[in-house]
Amino acid sequence: MTGLVDQQELEKRLATEEDSQNEDIENQLPSIETIINTYREKENRRVNLRFKAIGRTPLLRKTVFSINASQRFEKVTRFLKKELGLPMNSSLVLYVNSSFAPSPDEIVGNLYDNFAIDSHLLINYCINVAFG
């Protein structure tokens, strides 16, 4: 009889410990509302872009613009062509921090998060390929 009581007691303790562990895990996870609010903030976030011409490329009168962080980089290219008065089928090469040319489907917010300097993402632009 003692063995049966000990086993029942042990099962109760294990069940209690498991319940407390589950509660701890639930307390560590963010609520659905928190997750949704974080997503909405990222969707509505705007980032600053600073444009700088390379070589004989036309200059912009205003060099700092703001864009929604969820936009793809191709939107930046189209916007800049429009601002410079270039035809949409013309060549325009954009570089981030004079280092690399991002893919048109890259998300602007990701570039900003990884390469922004002084709260601006520096975009160098030119009509011809400037760097290898």
Curated annotation (Swiss-Prot):
Task: List the GO cellular component terms.
Answer: Atg12-Atg5-Atg16 complex; autophagosome membrane; cytosol; nucleus; phagophore assembly site membrane
Q: Where is this cross-link: Glycyl lysine isopeptide (Gly-Lys) (interchain with K-148 in ATG5)?
A: 132
Gene disruption: observed consequences: Impairs atg8-processing.
Topology class, membrane: Peripheral membrane protein
Q: Where in the cell is it found?
A: Cytoplasm; Nucleus; Preautophagosomal structure membrane
Note whether Lipid biosynthesis occurs among the keywords.
Answer: no
UniProt lists the family membership as follows: Belongs to the ATG12 family.
Q: What is this protein identified as? A: Ubiquitin-like protein ATG12
Identify the species of origin: Schizosaccharomyces pombe (strain 972 / ATCC 24843)
